[in-house]
């Protein structure tokens, strides 16, 4: 999985046994502002994030998710991904809908 840069973030990818962990660094502050972890188990892709800014008031999680969701759709050809843990506000803001007890988002290539 690739590292990438957005207008405000450098995002470092670390491959893990069951997926990938992206560490988000704010370019200006040069500090870690969060992580997003993608796991792939039993043909199901799931995302989790951690942040000091739980509701993503600064928009860093949303900014990184935009690129990550595009990558998952175009490169891995996933059609759906689930959001687990984190804030309902963040998942809904990023196009996820509550299904059963987790958030789901369809992906289009």
Residue ranges and their predicted role:
Residues 87-94:
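Acidic, divalent-metal-coordinating active-site segment for phosphoryl/phosphodiester hydrolysis
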Residues 57-74, 93:
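Conserved acetyl-CoA-binding loop-helix of GNAT-fold acetyltransferases
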Residues 1-54, 71, 75-86, 98-109:
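GNAT-family acyltransferases
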């Amino acid at each position: 999985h690739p590292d990438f840069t957005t207008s405000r973030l450098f995002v470092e990818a670390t491959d893990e046994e069951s997926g990938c962990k992206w560490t988000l660094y704010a370019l200006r502050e040069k500090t870690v502002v969060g992580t997003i972890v993608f796991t792939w188990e039993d043909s199901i892709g799931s995302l989790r994030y951690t942040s000091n800014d739980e509701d993503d008031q600064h928009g860093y999680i949303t900014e990184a998710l935009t690129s990550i969701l595009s990558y998952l759709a175009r490169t891995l050809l996933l059609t759906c991904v689930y959001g687990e843990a984190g804030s309902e506000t963040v998942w809904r803001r990023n196009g996820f809908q509550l299904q059963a007890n987790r958030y789901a988002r369809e992906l289009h290539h």
